[in-house]
Amino acid sequence: IVSNYTGEEMDNFASVLENYGVKTVNGIILEADTNHYISQNPSYLLPNIESNDITSNLSSQSRYILMPLAQGIETTDNYRDTLTIQNILTTSDSSYSKVNVENMQTMEKESGDIDGPFHVGVAISEDLEDDKQTQIVYYSSETLFNDNMNTMVSGANFELISASVNWMCSNEDGSTISISSKSLDTSTLTIPAADASFWSIFVMAVVPAFLVILGGGIWMKRRKQ
């Protein structure tokens, strides 16, 4: 299941989610932690990748998932005990949900905005009779399927989608459905906003200052000779 933010009420969709123990948080998530967003845009989330069967390869390789314009996902208060809900992607403790999206004047946290952290991807399973099982994966932003977003994280978004499908389609013998793909696109290096700021300052200020000092030292040495 994939959803996208809308200002309209979606009662039927909400009832389906709540039947499986989850619901969406009002608004769009913004990050205050510069290690969890890119492009100087707090809505371009780099969520934490939680460790589970779906994310094992991605988390072990310290990959990034990029999810712009995501809504928060939270569990309902009294979901039935036959449901198992695992977190796939979560935001940082500094994240918050901007409630008044249509009239948003600032990206700063305001009164009425909802404190994080939030889930932005969950895996839900439920054991049924006759050894059958319901399996659902839910992500709260359709941008996960966007080619440009996928390229910005070197294909990690599509790998997550493939792993999610594999988890839901796995057979009793443990085999999975897998379609490998090769891309001719140039890989993109994804750097969190905090790291980007550091390297910008380093390249634009520290390196030139070092070269000036080094050049001055060489000039003084030659002058004395």
Task: For the regions a language model picked out, list residue spans one by one.
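Hydrophobic alpha-helical transmembrane segments of integral membrane proteins
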Residues: M204-A205, L211
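Short, aromatic-rich amphipathic segments at membrane interfaces
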Residues: L144, T151, S178-V203
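Long, positively charged, glycine-interspersed low-complexity recognition regions
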Residues: N12, A205-V206, G216
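Acidic, S/T/G-rich, low-cysteine, solvent-exposed domains in lumenal/extracellular/periplasmic regions
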Residues: I1-S175
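Juxtamembrane interface at the cytosolic side of transmembrane helices
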Residues: V212-Q225
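Noncatalytic linker/hinge segments flanking ATPase motor cores
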Residues: Q40-P47, I177-T188, W219-R222
